[in-house]
């Protein structure tokens, strides 16, 4: 569900969003495009997606014919530009592709010390061996750039600076023509509900001539049925930093308020205890936060539905009409989040703290 939208008559625009799930980029950009299809829309994605074998890593069953496939041309056709978002560590195969293109099929011992290669079983191998079926999965082990031997470490770091500068220049050139640019400056998914620091390089390069807008996203994973994604599109006012403004603008959901009760309330509780606690928390929310209208309109129905969902997932167990929280707190739709209860509570705390800071600004 969406509240707010970009204006139809707009020039160079940056749409800045937080990052929790892989589907949000497709959803937001598709809706943005179909609302105003005559407006060019540009996105960026990690350079990992522009590397040979990306599809084989994401969809292993295709590996027999995609390990040597590079999709850079396809991404360019869809107005997706590359950006380097892994500054200190990268998959070994990513470093290997860069160094192989510059130096040929070097022995792996030439670029990494033996203690880094031995756990992976790559002693005696050359760079090109990493794309072999038997090695491909292990070749995606993450390696700190600092572990590289000289002169390759220095070369990779120098290339990182040059590539980043070139990537940003390409984005600036496209947006300056009047395009709308979708970006997630966090770089990676949040794992604990708290947003990562906003990386400012691209936004700082665009802000002198482009209008900045926020796309503040929250999910409501404890509600039944399809995963509810709630987001607001609103103009960035500049009254606080982008991270604070984005966090404060996220919709407050049933899942977030219920999670706070589950972690802070009694060990066992009745359904009406949870309903009462969520109602009380709703009444105490500051005026400058946005609450899911469905929750505001019918809090009891929303909480009862969420309790039923959590019981089906065995996150809650019921005994004599009283619930208790279990250790099964993951959600299969968010594989990067080990504890969705804690995630939702942390997100609520950060949203409220950001709203307070915004109110004082």
Where are these regions (language model features)?
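Catalytic micro-motifs at enzyme active sites that drive phosphoryl/nucleotidyl and oxygen chemistry
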Residues: 3-4, 63, 68-71, 170-171, ...
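A short, well-structured juxtamembrane/interface segment
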Residues: 1-12, 170, 174-177
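Catalytic core of membrane glycerolipid acyltransferases/transacylases, capturing the structured
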Residues: 13-156
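Non-catalytic C-terminal accessory region of glycerolipid acyltransferases
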Residues: 90-361
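Short coil/turn segments at beta-strand junctions that form active-site/ligand-binding loops
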Residues: 10-13, 39, 177-179, 210
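Broad hydrophobic/π-residue packing in well-ordered secondary structure
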Residues: 2, 22, 42-43, 48-52, ...
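Generic low-polarity alpha-helical segments
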Residues: 2-6, 43, 74-75, 80-81, ...
């Amino acid at each position: 569900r969406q509240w707010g939208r970009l204006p139809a008559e707009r020039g160079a625009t940056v749409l800045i969003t937080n990052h929790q799930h892989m589907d949000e980029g497709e959803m937001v950009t598709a809706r943005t495009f179909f609302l105003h299809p005559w407006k060019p829309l540009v996105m960026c994605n990690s350079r990992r997606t522009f590397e040979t074998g990306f599809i084989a890593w994401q969809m292993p069953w295709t590996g027999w014919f995609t390990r040597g496939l590079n999709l850079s041309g396809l991404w360019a056709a869809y107005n997706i530009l590359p950006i380097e978002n892994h500054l200190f560590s990268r998959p070994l195969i990513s470093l290997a592709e860069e160094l192989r293109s510059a130096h040929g099929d070097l022995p792996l011992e030439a670029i990494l010390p033996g203690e880094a290669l031995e756990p992976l079983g790559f002693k005696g191998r050359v760079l090109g061996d990493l794309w072999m079926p038997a090695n491909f999965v292990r070749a995606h082990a993450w390696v700190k750039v600092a572990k590289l031997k000289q002169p390759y470490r220095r070369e990779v770091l120098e290339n990182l600076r040059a590539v980043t500068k070139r990537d940003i220049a390409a984005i600036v050139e496209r947006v300056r023509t009047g395009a709308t640019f979708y970006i997630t400056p966090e770089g990676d998914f949040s794992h604990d509900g708290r947003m990562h620091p906003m990386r400012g390089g691209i936004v700082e390069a665009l802000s002198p001539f482009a209008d900045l807008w926020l796309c503040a996203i929250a999910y409501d994973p404890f509600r039944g049925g399809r995963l509810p994604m709630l987001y607001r599109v609103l103009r960035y006012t500049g009254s606080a930093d982008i991270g604070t403004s984005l966090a404060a603008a996220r919709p407050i959901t049933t899942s977030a308020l219920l999670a706070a009760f589950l972690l802070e309330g009694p060990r066992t509780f009745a359904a009406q205890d949870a309903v009462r606690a969520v109602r009380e928390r709703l009444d105490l929310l500051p005026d400058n936060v946005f609450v899911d209208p469905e929750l505001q309109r019918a809090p009891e129905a929303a909480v009862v539905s969420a309790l039923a969902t959590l019981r089906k997932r065995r996150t809650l167990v019921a005994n004599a009409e009283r619930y208790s929280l279990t250790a099964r707190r993951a959600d299969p739709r968010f594989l990067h989040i080990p504890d969705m209860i804690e995630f939702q509570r942390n997100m609520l705390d950060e949203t409220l703290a950001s709203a307070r800071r915004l109110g004082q600004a």
